[in-house]
């Protein structure tokens, strides 16, 4: 008897990191290759707000993703090389080689804010999904992201209002 592999939800987001707002969302059933979701999420995020630096984890390291960010969207890419121990001469791709030479931990560390977004959503709204069907699950996640953005905007507005009142 073979066991079917349990499929889970995989969420890819594009976020504006200065204010920690979600600008684009892609939901799918996992496990799945991350590179498939990268172009639509990045293009949608860029249409909402132009990207200055595109930051992704090792799963997004491919020459195509670097080309998309740099040539099409005119943004800097900051994606760490998948195999950092491989010699530079054996790394394929112009932008991947450049990333190996000029990778900045300080800039890449901003990616932790994406994880903060996931953490805040799970803490404030719970990590259990109430929907059963895939379409309902996808909609539930999208609504959670909208609610998260509304919460962030409202708290920054109220926080700014209170600071101006008591300064």
Model-identified regions with their sequence ranges:
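Polybasic low-complexity intrinsically disordered regions
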Residues: 1-73, 145
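A short, polar/proline- and glycine-enriched secondary-structure boundary/capping micro-motif
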Residues: 33-37, 89-90, 166
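Helix-centered, glycine/charged polyanion-binding patches within enzymatic domains
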Residues: 58-131
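C-terminal domain-tail junction helix/linker
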Residues: 130-167
